[in-house]
Structure formats: structure tokens, C-alpha cells
Design a protein with these regions (language model features):
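N-terminal "arm"/small-domain region of PLP-dependent enzymes with the aminotransferase-like
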Residues: 1-46, 128, 367-368
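Short loop-beta-helix segment that forms the pyridoxal 5′-phosphate
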Residues: 48, 60-82
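Active-site phosphate-binding strand-loop segment of PLP-dependent enzymes
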Residues: 120-197
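PLP-dependent aminotransferase class I/II
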Residues: 29-30, 214-298
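Helix C-cap/helix->beta junction micro-motif
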Residues: 108, 182-183, 212, 294
Length: 369
């Protein structure tokens, strides 16, 4: 049976020049991490530290959390799958959100329930009566709380949410956590995109880890440090007993020596994060108004990506001009008129607009950069 791959980044079967389907850092992997990974290759004749203790200590220092609460993994995906196997049953997530949660839950034999929008099409009327998805954070949290009952064993909350860009406050997440604790459910907050934001320090749930045993926080080097091909992530766990059960689902030596060394090097490069956030702010300001002139609707949230609506065949038409974008019809609550692009470097974003103009036949932006 053929594997049904629905995520972005499939450049291997799509001959393209520009990949806007993934949300990795356009600055590329930090130079120190590249050098560390090269040094790690020389050491690959030995087994990696199966505990990844040096990496865990580096993460603990950077995030001010106990090193013994950190579970390293071969990217966030491996940790999600281990979590799905450890806590089988019914999980709850907002809709739309990252499709990997449902895949991990299904692989563990569980079921996914969604707190979606108000009608069957995933749309609700806004204050002006227009047909529009409701992505505002408090609206989403209210729907999630209404759906959370004692049938739920695990709640996933992506912050900021992929693909909508909705950013949730600590107060909102703590309300979800309080109800989940009362229902004996766990809450996994996915913060893989949070380091892209200046708001990281005020929105991360990592400081609450030791106070709430039902809290888990998922992070990855994949997106923020552009290590998608190297694979490195971690799950911070408030419950030490649950942590042991999750570890039991993982293979030994699941993080390579090059990945461990690259991760340690990345955490020491604070200038890289500052440059990343500066680039994102500038390029979001460049892309949003231009996209709004060319597509049906743009949802300007947080994170290094943009969700928008247009004609269903836009992905195929963009492939014809050498650009891969993420079609979002497989996201719960969205249809084939929704698309997502990663926010790239300025030159790449300029080229994206030029090629979108070519596809749309719109000359308004033809001579603008």
C-alpha cells in the first residue's frame, strides 16, 4: 500500500525552484551548528549517547527547566508518535491544526476529536455577517473548553497554531490545563513555532512544567534552526512517571551524534534568533499587502507562515512556474480553497510574488519588488 504523504516539503516528487510548502527558517542552519554537525560525522563510528545528556543540559540551561524533564527525539514527529502510543484513547485538538497529531493518535490506536467551527463547512458568520473562519484566540479556546470532557485523555494545542497563526496567551492555556486536570487528561502544548516570535518569553508554558504534572511542552530544532533533514526535537514532561512510559516507546540511540552536537551549538547562538525575528517581521510586512491584492483572502496571524484562500487549482498552477505551496484541504475544517506558504527570505518572497502575478495574470505588481 502506498504511503499517503500529505505534509509539505515533498520536493523529491515535485521538480521545483522554490519550496514555500514548509515553514523552516529561511536563514538556514546556524553556521556553528553546521560546523558541529560536520565534527559529529567524524564521530559516527561510535554510538551516540542514548540519553543525550549534554544536549539535555544545554536545553535545560537555555530554557531554565530541569534537565531530567527533557525527552530528546528524532524530530517532534517521533515524540508525537511515542506520546500517541503512551496515552491511547480519545485526543482533542482545535480545527484546523497540525495534521500530525491525528496521524500520531491513529498510529497508537486512538481517535481524534476536534473542537471545530460552528457549522459543517467549518465557517461561521463574523460581526459583519460575512462567511469567515473564526480564528480569534478566545473564540477558539471557548470551543475547545466546551468540547473537553471526561472522555478525553489528551489535548493538543499548537501555539502559535499551524496553519492559522492564532497565538494563545498563558492565561488561556492555563484555563484549558485546569479543566484537563479536573478531567484527568494531559495537555500537550506544541511550541515548535514560538521561538520565531518576540512574544516567546511571555507565552511559553515551559516555566509551568514543574507545577503541572498534566502538562507537556513539545519543541523542535527543525523549524527554528532549519534542521528538517537532521531531525531533532524534545518533549518536556511535567509527570516523571509518564516520562518513563514515553521513553519506553522510543528506540535507543534515537538522536544521532551530528544532531546532538548541532543542537547544542544552535542553543548558544542568540544573535541567530534576533536576526530570525527581524527577518520575519520585515517579510510578513512585505508579503501580506501584496498577497491581499492577488488572492481571495489572507489570514494574518503569528508565526513564519501565512494562510490564505484562492481557487482550488492554485497549487498545480504554481507548480507550473516552479513553486511548491502547501494545499490545506487535508486540514480538519478547511477545504481545497485554503493554502499556506512559509515566509522566506526577501529575494525568495519577491520571486514568489512575481510568479504568483504570472499565474494570476495580474500586472499590478509586475514591476514592483
Amino acid at each position: 500500500m502506498e504511503y499517503n504523504y500529505t505534509h509539505g516539503g515533498d520536493v523529491y516528487r515535485n521538480p521545483i525552484e522554490y519550496d514555500f510548502s514548509i515553514n523552516v527558517n529561511p536563514l538556514g542552519m546556524p553556521l556553528a551548528s553546521i560546523q558541529a554537525a560536520h565534527e559529529g560525522i567524524v564521530l559516527t563510528g561510535r554510538y551516540p549517547d542514548y540519553r543525550a545528556e549534554q544536549l539535555c543540559r544545554a536545553i535545560a540551561k537555555a530554557q531554565n527547566i530541569p534537565a531530567d524533564r527533557i525527552i530528546p527525539g528524532n524530530g517532534a514527529a517521533e515524540l508525537l508518535y511515542a506520546l500517541g502510543q503512551t496515552i491511547p484513547g480519545t485526543a482533542l485538538a482545535i480545527a484546523p491544526t497540525f495534521t500530525g497529531y491525528a496521524e500520531a493518535v491513529a498510529a497508537g490506536g486512538g481517535e481524534m476529536s476536534y473542537a471545530g467551527c460552528e457549522d459543517a463547512d467549518g465557517r461561521a458568520a463574523d460581526m459583519d455577517g460575512q462567511d469567515k473562519l473564526q480564528f480569534e484566540s478566545e473564540t477558539v479556546i471557548q470551543r475547545l473548553l466546551a468540547k473537553l470532557d471526561d472522555s478525553i485523555c489528551l489535548v493538543f494545542l499548537c501555539n502559535p497554531n499551524n496553519p492559522t497563526g492564532t497565538l494563545f496567551t498563558r492565561e488561556q492555556i492555563l484555563r484549558v490545563l485546569a479543566k484537563a486536570e479536573a478531567m484527568q487528561a494531559y495537555v500537550c502544548v506544541d511550541e515548535c513555532f514560538l521561538p520565531f516570535l518576540e512574544e516567546e518569553a511571555s507565552h511559553s508554558m515551559l516555566p509551568y512544567l514543574t507545577k503541572h504534572t498534566r502538562l507537556l511542552v513539545l519543541r523542535a530544532f527543525t523549524k527554528i534552526y532549519c534542521m528538517a533533514g537532521l531531525r531533532l526535537g524534545y518533549l518536556a514532561c511535567g509527570d516523571t512517571e509518564l516520562q518513563s512510559r514515553i521513553r519506553a516507546k522510543l528506540q535507543p540511540w534515537n538522536t544521532s551524534i551530528p544532531a546532538q552536537l548541532a543542537g547544542i551549538a544552535a542553543l548558544s547562538d542568540t544573535e541567530y534568533l534576533a536576526k530570525t525575528r527581524e527577518n520575519l517581521q520585515a517579510e510578513r510586512a512585505y508579503l501580506v499587502p501584496r498577497l491581499r491584492e492577488l488572492v481571495a483572502e489572507v489570514y494574518d496571524g503569528y508565526g513564519n507562515f501565512l494562510l490564505f484562500r484562492d481557487e482550488p487549482d492554485l497549487k498545480e498552477r504554481m507548480l507550473e512556474v516552479g513553486v511548491l505551496i502547501r494545499a490545506c484541504g487535508d486540514f480538519e475544517g478547511l477545504d481545497d480553497t485554503y493554502f499556506r506558504i512559509g515566509i522566506r527570505s526577501h529575494s525568495e518572497n519577491q520571486e514568489f510574488i512575481r510568479r504568483l502575478v504570472r499565474v494570476k495574470g495580474d500586472t499590478k505588481w509586475q514591476n514592483q519588488s
